[in-house]
């Protein structure tokens, strides 16, 4: 599969055809699942990534918080790469908004953490 760059909307610009499509897009209330454009986008993203479903959100920061908070709750710790966007550039959102404490680990040039580092960082249940 080709690499899909989801870094930010700031690294891409809409083409004239994209702007034209936006001007003529059908719209509806996406809160109630009534926006055909959002529904089609979510279906397309799910199909492209081989997933059962997809969720459109307004920013990468929001998507990162949703991912973290779907797996952790206040007081939990999240193991993250020390160069990851969610750790370096999101204003401490996981801690500030979610109460989840980041546990940063070093990453290599490809952005990967070493398995041994991850295994060493996992903490057992704390009765305190």
Predicted regions mapped to residue ranges:
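N-terminal amphipathic/basic leader segments beginning at the initiator methionine
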Residues: 1-21
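Structural motif
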Residues: 4, 53-56, 76-78, 101-103
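Conserved N-terminal alpha-helix of the aminotransferase class I/II PLP-enzyme fold
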Residues: 14-60, 82-83, 87-88, 93
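Binding-interface segments
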Residues: 63
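Alpha/beta catalytic barrel-like cores
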Residues: 67, 81-82
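Glycine-rich loop at the start of a catalytic domain that most often binds anionic cofactors/ligands
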Residues: 67-75, 93
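Short, flexible, glycine-rich and Lys/Arg-enriched loop motifs at helix boundaries
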Residues: 85-86, 90-96, 122-128
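PLP-dependent aminotransferase-class I/II
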Residues: 99-128
